[in-house]
C-alpha cells in the first residue's frame, strides 16, 4: 500500500485559506445598515479592521495596531464550527468555551504548526482580554454592533427586547480599551435609543 504523502507547507496554508471562506456563511444577529439582512462574521471582521485603522488613535494606551488587526481578523474563525453565540444568550454562553476550544483545535490545526500556534495564541490572548491590544479589540467588537443597531433604528434591540442593564454589563470593560470611544458610543448610539424606548431602561 502506497504511503500517503505528507502535505506541503503551501498546501496546508491554502487548505486553511479555503476553510476560512466558510466564515462568510456564519450569520450574526446584527443587521446591516440597510436593515434588510443580518451581517456575517467575515463582514463583521472586515468592518472592525477598518475601524481599527481609523480609530486606534483613541486607545487608552499605545497599542500594536497590526496585532489588533490580526486578532480581529482571526478570533471569530472558531465560529465556523462553534457557531455564533449571541451577546445576550446566557444559555449559549455556558457551552461557548468548550465548543470554541474544540473548533480552535481543528481550524488552527489545519495550518503548518508554527502558523497554527501563532494564530491559536492570538485567539487565546483575545479570549483572556488582558493586554492593551485585546482591550482595544474588544472596544471594536462592542462598538461596531452598537453603531449598526443605532443606524437600523434599534431593529435587533427591539426584536430581542434588549435591556440597558444587559448592554452595560456587556460593556463593563469597554472603557478600559478606549474611554473616548465608549463615551462616544454611549452618547451617540445607546442613550438616544434608551430615550426613544428602543432599549428598555431597567436601571431606574
Regions found by a protein language model. Give the residues of each.
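Alpha-helical, largely C-terminal catalytic domains
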Residues: 1-204
